């Protein structure tokens, strides 16, 4: 029944999704203002969702242009569908324009198809279809739309300062059948705050280093500018040998007497950095072979001692595992250095229930202080968990099983979704077990089958939970 109903709307779903995907809704702090709190792109995407909602007869409510909601249904209780329309930067290496959606016979290719614009449109259409069926709602539906999920969650932080908190809800921002637990997520900067003096002119001076744009992405590019006193050819040859030995890509060029070294890695979501290739850490690992100026040498040595080839907090003394949520993970998403101010490592650490985060960070902070480094804590979100046998969760899972015939159990993840804003919130789709996970990677896509099947699952689940029989 539900899949047949979705068939009537497939062309409309694709058109509305293409419009949303065409908006480059990446956070841009340098363009932020009161009108565009995290930049013009995310604001434009938020307004786009208001526009299609008003076209379809729904009410909307804006919260300071950084978040808002689409309203449907009726009743005392509120059911929340928590979505986001911001995306991570596209990065390089795409086979097509990431913000000019390509629609083939079986897929839609663009940044945000999986995370989270495709699932957002699927959930929206589930509500739209039910509304156009003139169902007898027993709950109010709030489709809550954020614009800063990929960075600091300023959107939901502001939204829930003044707006009603749903009793139940889901975030269509992960996988089916359902995610009932999410690791704690923290971001912090390790800052080099002591410069060392060189008594003699160094053989190699690190002028600058840059890698990564987001804490929650494994950086796929790193660039270092090195002033070479002598033996330039030897350094270039050693760099090429290093790339071959470590099976990573890169290049070197000489620009105005300065050696520019570049490494290409593999960007993946920061929740599991072990499956990516961190370009920044590999380039620092090569720089460790050079007799650098002392300040740079201390920066590189820090990476070697605590970060390189340590995806699970081992080198920082934070290794921890539970059977329910798995391992601590550490992603070094941002690395910067210049010869005037020193360097910074931007770290995204994810941890399971039972991990003593504050105690561990305090210990690590004390350990690195003597090395000339300090820590600035950004955001820390504690782990989130809903019991697997909760009736609400089971209702969602049953809708999934009815539509797919798959009896896979709900599970926990290292990622973080808006579901953790709710006491009883879970992540629910829109990826399936056979979906290729290209979130935060080049050539991100969603299949039409996945998009329409997710819409059908959302339809059935919302009908069971929010409509009078």
From Swiss-Prot:
The keyword Protease applies. Binds 2 Zn(2+) ions per subunit. This is Putative dipeptidase SSP1012. Its cofactor is Zn(2+). Keywords: Dipeptidase, Hydrolase, Metal-binding, Metalloprotease, Protease, Zinc. Belongs to the peptidase M20A family. Its EC number is 3.4.13.-. It holds the Pfam family Peptidase_M20. Coiled coil: none annotated.
